[in-house]
Amino acid sequence: MTISRAVYAGAVVLASVVALGAWNPLGQANAREGKSGQVPRFVVDPLWPKPIPARWVTGEVAGTCIDSRDHIFTVNRRNADALETSFGWPLAPPVVEYDGEGNVVNAWGNPAVVPTGLHGCFVDYQDNVWIAGNGDGIVQKYSHDGTLLLQIGTKGHCDSPTGACGVPDSNSSPIYLNEPADVSVDPANGDVYVADGYGNHRVAVFDKNGRFLRQWGSAGTAPGQFAPGGGGHPHCVVFDNRGLLYVCDRANDRIQVFDKFGNLKEVIPVKPGTGSVPGPYGNPDGSGRNAVGSANDLDFSIDRDQQYMFVNDVGNSSLWVFDRLLGNRILGGFGRPGHQAGEFTLFHSVAVDSKGNMYTGETVGGRRSQKFVPRGFISTEHLETFRGSPHYDPLPGKGAERRDD
């Protein structure tokens, strides 16, 4: 099993129909071996997770990751809305651990210590839990039960001339980060790869002790660059089982594939131009469009070849399935905007366990986790023609703790 925030995936179909489980399940025997012209599909489990203790309020679920026991970790921003505050419901701890049945088995984290603006989450090959924060300058490594083991960067001090967080494009410090979005660990040697993508636009690499090794990337649209602006570019870093690093370049609507030293191997488009909608930030071209983008997070199927890549498209409230054996062709997808089971609002993270169950997290407006169970395959000839989503949820104003994704 490959440990990252997820591990396998199986995936997808007719937008809402299959995601909501209206189709009769296909044979489970085929769920691990895809064939040309077939798309893996999921059915939503509307009863996952089970009610959490003491009416905890998780707020926005920014990151989702899975350990070697198929326990699901979520990182929660704990931002109660007005109704929740009026009832006096307690805030959940920043990190909550669930078993596969949806029971809370542990929870931990000191709100004063964890990164501001909790964001990405990763479980490494030793079952340590890593978290990043896009309102801060740190990435942290915790033991499985929540003991802080390592911190890269300085809390409240970012890579900028004044140390302020969110000042764009410094891209220079070997010791400071600038609102990192995500983190991944190389199981071969323990090196740490950081998507330093909200203030900076780089992948920064550290050894297992936190010593800076190298970096690559800058703001732009050329191959090897990451989209300008403050929306998390790069937004995810995920290793495949060949040791290649897949990096989400969200507002450029693409996944960029690098070797461990930053040599670009491939650029994979993800529905270009469809995930950008009117909003407060605007694109660098001055169009007044929201740079939310379509390449937010990803994971792979658990078969030996990792045939399928699953990409979380926040701008279109969809999950796309790519066939890597067919030149990273998009086979299909599921999801639509909404708040019912199987729908997404600010679809932010995706993770898959060793059984092929997919777990998702939603931030602004969504504020929840969902579970999708694999149910065989469907022929691509039954898939709907894609239409870009006109829906978006307004992103919040600028602030120290970014909530946009």
Task: Give residue spans per PLM region.
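Eukaryotic scaffold repeat domains enriched in small/polar residues
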Residues: 4-10, 19-405
